[in-house]
């Protein structure tokens, strides 16, 4: 599953999006679908290099 992550400029929040977000000092998409995630999870993601596409894989526990 591919998602996008992006960091806000002003409050340093990190968001996960199902589609590519747009920028106006903060990140949004046309349906405003976003999930705020722990801002310490991806320290390499900055406002300047946002958004970045990532792939999430579900791990099945046995």
Question: Where do the language-model regions lie?
Answer:
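Intrinsic low-complexity, intrinsically disordered segments enriched in polar/basic residues
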Residues: 1, 15-17, 62
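Generic structural signal for short, solvent-exposed loop/turn connectors between secondary structure elements
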Residues: 1-2, 32
């Amino acid at each position: 599953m591919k998602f996008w992550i992006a960091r806000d400029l002003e409050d340093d929040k990190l968001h996960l999006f199902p589609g590519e977000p747009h920028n106006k000092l903060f990140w949004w998409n046309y349906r405003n679908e976003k999930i705020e995630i722990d801002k310490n999870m991806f320290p390499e993601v900055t406002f300047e290099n946002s958004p970045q596409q990532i792939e999430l894989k579900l791990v099945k526990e046995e």
